[in-house]
Every structure is written in structure tokens, then in C-alpha cells.
Amino acid sequence: MDGVFKMIDIHLLDIDNDQPRKSVSLVELEELSISIKENGILQPLIVCKANDRYKIIVGERRFRAAKLIQLTNIPVIEVDIKESCKDFMPLVENIQRENFTPVEEAYAYKNIMNKYSLTQKDLSEKIGKSRTYISNLVRILDLEQEILNAIHRKEISFGHAKVILSLKDRQDRYNLYLIILKKKFSVRDAEKYVKNFSKSIVKKRELEQDPFLNNIKEFLFDKIQTKIDIKGNQNKGKIEIEYFTAGDLKRIVSLFGHSS
């Protein structure tokens, strides 16, 4: 956001009472005031001119903390901001400042994009986060409400949610969610599960889509009476024959004319 940097008297600053805002805890303000006392205000407040005074657009917490330590002059960037966009920056600041859960943050970004007709790219440029981050975050809203509730309650993490979303089928997603809860899967465990699950799905689909290989598999099973796995296609691949005991192995090889 373009603007003019200046130092102004703190008494000329006013809080915008129209800003949507949750209460600011005294503990947070005291911690911030200590930081300001030691290091100064590292990031100027964003303000706009209102008659002979200035209205705070972004930086209310810094303003309040500065007042706690009786700071007299404060760094600001004065901007000329359209009336229709005045509430945009405070909304974004609130989201980034508060300890939102991923679900709350996702809903907030989605609402902002809808309200201001922004694309994910537009929003990413305005708030300094990557488009991929926003995309992944908003995507979790596609999950079932039960899963969203679990994320909100911190029973599963945002990382878990991204892994669940890697599955296309909703029933598969829900099953993975239940497994994560039951087996207390870490994100890495969930990723391994999806990798193995995806391999089995691909293998199953290959056979389903190739009647010739499926017929071969059924023929071999009838002849050998054990688990058969065919990997590949009609031109190249491999056949795996499983045995479960020494006797089973002898029985299978004897079918090919081997005698022990």
C-alpha cells in the first residue's frame, strides 16, 4: 500500500470504532509495550487523514501499547484509502493477529474474497501470504462438517486435513479421518497410508480396466489356488505368486513339474 511516512503526535490518533474487533487482552498489550520500549515500533501504523486528525486503519494494538508506556510520537504511513475499502485492512490484521484455528481463518479469507470480489492471487498479494497457502486453507472447507469440527477442536491438524484432501472420494476421506483418530496417526503416518492406498487403487483400476489381465489372474488362481498379483499391462509387467507355508511352496512348484 503506497503512502507517506511521518512521525506524528500520538494524541492526534483516533481508533476507528467501526472496525470489527475482538477484545485485546491486557497481557498481550503489556508484552507488546515491553517490546516497543526496547526496540521501538518496527512497523509503522497505517492511518488516513480525518479533518485535522488521523484515523487508525491498521495498528490499533501498537497504538494502545505505545500509550501504555506514554510514547509521545509514533511512526505512521498516511494513505489515501477509498471509503469502501476502509474495513479491509483491519479485517486482515485481525485475522493475522488473533489465534484463529485453520477453519476460522479459512472462513475469514473466504468471506473477504467474496465481499471484495478478490481472487486468491489478489488476496495473497494484499496480505503477504502465498496463493498456495490460501488455496490449501480455503480448500479444507470442502471437508465434511465433522472433520472441520475436529480441526477446530485441534483433534487433527491442518497438515492432517491437507492429506485427507489428497483423496478424491469423500468416503475414502472420511475413512482416513476415522483411522487418524483411532490410530493416532501423525501427518507422516497419514501420508504413508495415502501412498499405499493410492497404489492399491491404481492396481485395482488397472485390472478392472484390462479384462485380459483380469481373466489371466482368475485363470491362474483357479490353477494354483493361491493369491496372484499381476502388475503392469499386456506388453510388460510381472506376475507375483504368494505362498504361506513350506508345504504351500512345494505344492505350487510341483504344478510346474518340479519335484523335491
UniProtKB/Swiss-Prot annotation:
CDD domains: HTH_XRE. One of its GO terms (molecular function) is DNA binding. Keywords: Chromosome partition, DNA-binding. InterPro entries: Chromosome_partition/occlusion, Cro/C1-type_HTH, HTH_ParB/Spo0J, ParB/RepB/Spo0J, ParB/Sulfiredoxin_dom, ParB/Sulfiredoxin_sf. GO terms for biological process: chromosome segregation; positive regulation of sporulation resulting in formation of a cellular spore. One of its GO terms (cellular component) is chromosome. Belongs to the ParB family. Involved in chromosome partition. Localize to both poles of the predivisional cell following completion of DNA replication. Binds to the DNA origin of replication. This is Probable chromosome-partitioning protein ParB.
